[in-house]
Amino acid sequence: MALWGGRFSQAADQRFKQFNDSLRFDYRLAEQDIIGSVAWSKALVTVGVLTTAEQQQLEQALSVLLEEVQADPQAILASDAEDIHSWVETKLIDKVGDLGKKLHTGRSRNDQVATDLKLWCKFQITELKTAVQQLQQALVITAEANQDAVMPGYTHLQRAQPVTFAHWCLAYAEMLARDESRLQDTLKRLDVSPLGSGALAGTAYAIDREQLAGWLGFASATRNSLDSVSDRDHVLELLSDASIGMVHLSRFAEDLIFFNSGEAAFVDLSDRVTSGSSLMPQKKNPDALELIRGKCGRVQGALTGMMMTLKGLPLAYNKDMQEDKEGLFDALDTWLDCLHMAALVLDGIQVKRPRCKEAAEQGYANATELADYLVAKGVPFREAHHIVGEAVVEAIRQGKALEALSLSDLQKFSAVIGDDVYPILALQSCLDKRVAKGGVSPQQVASAIAEAKARLF
């Protein structure tokens, strides 16, 4: 039975009911709805609506219902209830009779669903933070094992300067640390309870909403009832967090797809995260990474869709806001799955050090070192930059690396170049010189790994 039938003389058209009902997705809020109902029953005791004995009876029945939901949440979907609130109330009445009809006193589905969703978001943030931390840990472990794996760093997808695979791993660990920080910031803002705001104007019962918030584990209660039932900022923020996080994972996936390609051949991916071709027997496709990259779009779409849903809504609650859940649920599920999959990819990755080093030695990745060498000899940097560009052209013409050019060849471009240039152009020297904080020198990379381990393990 609908919770609002008294006003109507005709039953809802079945097609409208199917269009209007939300149980098929908001059943995921069942645990939160029950937890909120227990807290609300306690609040009703404080204002004389329920006796202590009645509240205890309701709480016991709700606790049994919670256990049933936890044992088989999918069983909820067999009901034709309009939404999860209707389902919980109906089940409660089945257990305790008319006493269950008293529970909704002073409460609206507007503040009820806002509370349920915030409680769900709080739990989900905890899950996501754990997954983000686990992926950071996987990156740090991989970095520690590959500190000596020299490879080319890229700009414009052109070889630029030598780095290490460890330094690459730590770059993504930094991105994930920001993702974790964003989740924590989102939690701070959503950690206020809307329960007790009623439909829009507040409840007529003198309930201590701060006490109620504390029972639910919120830091405080909201300050304005209109805003409380209208606010979906936390949905937007979480979708934004997920969108940014998925951009990071998509870039991670793209890098590894390239590193795994036959053209780069820097890494081998585990058989556990790759698949084959139905036609070409030689293929080993990076499907896990391609799916991570592909799923980024659906998460961005959820954020855009939610922003468009909210942008024209007047205060307070509107049915449009029922559209807040499916996109949020899917986006956060997707992000969580991709975080786990990215960690699995790293678990079995093999870095091909000889090939990485070979690539780093090509493409004139040490050209900047020659420019810095000239600067140290008193040549202005802009002039040094031009000189090295000419030297690179000559090296390309001869089909040689910069360090393979003879001293006489190099001195054609600048007389200040001496024999001491050759150690400077060595690959390891290029790394060793990057000693400033955040650089790719072995000392800085080791320090960054130590800092990350202290934070994460």
From Swiss-Prot:
One of its GO terms (cellular component) is cytosol. Its main location: cytoplasm. It comes from the Bacteria. Pathway: Amino-acid biosynthesis; L-arginine biosynthesis; L-arginine from L-ornithine and carbamoyl phosphate: step 3/3. InterPro entries: Arg_succ_lyase_C, Argininosuccinate_lyase, Fumarase/histidase_N, Fumarate_lyase_CS, Fumarate_lyase_fam, Fumarate_lyase_N, L-Aspartase-like. GO terms for molecular function: argininosuccinate lyase activity. Belongs to the lyase 1 family. Argininosuccinate lyase subfamily. This is Argininosuccinate lyase. It comes from Yersinia enterocolitica serotype O:8 / biotype 1B (strain NCTC 13174 / 8081). The gene is argH.
